Regions:
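Start-transfer (signal-anchor) and selected internal transmembrane alpha helices
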Residues: 1-28, 219-220
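Coil-to-alpha-helix initiation sites in intrinsically disordered, low-complexity, charged segments
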Residues: 3, 69-72, 76, 120, ...
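Short alpha-helical segments and helix-capping/turn motifs at coil-helix boundaries
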Residues: 3-10, 64-65, 106-111
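Membrane-water interface of alpha-helical transmembrane segments
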Residues: 7-12, 90, 94-97, 117-121, ...
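Membrane-interface coil-to-helix junctions
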Residues: 20-105, 129-151
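Periplasmic/ER-lumenal interhelical loops and adjacent helix-loop junctions
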Residues: 48-61, 65, 217-220, 224-244
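Short coil/turn helix-boundary motifs
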Residues: 85-88, 166-167, 210
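Membrane-embedded helix bundles of polyisoprenyl
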Residues: 102-115, 120-208, 220-240
Length: 244
């Protein structure tokens, strides 16, 4: 045991302890009871919701209504896979959210260390903890429409930052678009679209720090925008069709 402790760094022990603490909070909260942060059927029967949400028109007791939830389909496919593994709705919810919070903290860690050369791994770890353990995340993160985009925001900004470092690359703009796609288009992607505004302060700060040319910035923004638009067509087209 002592040899093992000697081989494991204090950073690894701290990180492992924090992950364990997060797991206790997520999995131990309301143990044995199912809670949801969106329509219950999303966790109860996600596979049946996929077909329903792929249509621009949804049935209801009042002759139906326009469907603006096509953007939720990627999430439904993931949840269907978890349910297919035999997880109950309660554990599907908890496993999904545990993964979300790990992704969020890891992304915040990576983003801070990439944006600030002097940031140590401990600074990155603190950034990840603070990104999760703050009043806004605790309160607003109770709804999936906010929690999912928020978890992926650091990764989207990290891809943007890397794209600015390598203006000729298409890989990082593609990663930017994929991060936006993974946020899903639920609620007509209102939250992810607002989060795109975060790119403005990032480029204003980094342009001066890295002496970037506006032409290079414009090229990266255009490529990121093209991928975002292209990967959003699956919910944009049905949403426009639902309007009329």
């Amino acid at each position: 045991m002592r040899r093992f402790a000697a081989r494991v760094s204090p950073y690894a022990l701290t990180t492992g302890g924090l992950v364990l603490f997060l797991a206790i909070i997520v999995f131990g909260n309301s143990l044995g009871h199912f809670h949801t942060d969106i329509k219950p059927e999303v966790y109860l029967a996600p596979w049946t919701m996929v077909e329903r949400y792929l249509s621009s028109w949804t049935s209801s007791p009042y002759l139906g209504s326009a469907n603006f939830n096509v953007g939720l389909v990627p999430v439904l496919l993931l949840l269907s896979a978890l349910r297919g593994l035999g997880l109950s709705p309660e554990w599907t919810f908890k496993v999904f959210h545990f993964a979300l919070w790990l992704v969020a903290a890891w992304g915040a860690n990576r983003l801070v260390r990439a944006a600030t050369v002097r940031a140590t791994k401990w600074v990155g770890l603190f950034a990840g903890v603070f990104y999760l353990a703050n009043p806004y995340t605790i309160a607003a993160g109770n709804t999936l429409a906010i929690a999912l985009p928020m978890a992926l925001l650091p990764w989207m900004l990290l891809a943007y930052l890397r794209g600015l470092q390598q203006p000729r690359s298409w890989a990082w703009p593609a990663a930017f678009g994929l991060a936006f796609f993974a946020m899903s288009g639920m609620n007509v992607a209102v939250v992810p679209i607002y989060q795109l505004l975060m790119a403005i302060p990032v480029v204003l700060v980094l342009r001066r720090a890295w002496s970037l040319r506006w032409s290079a910035v414009a090229s990266v923004v255009a490529k990121c925008g093209a991928f975002v638009l292209g990967l959003s067509l699956y919910w944009l087209v049905p949403s426009f069709a639902a309007q009329g």
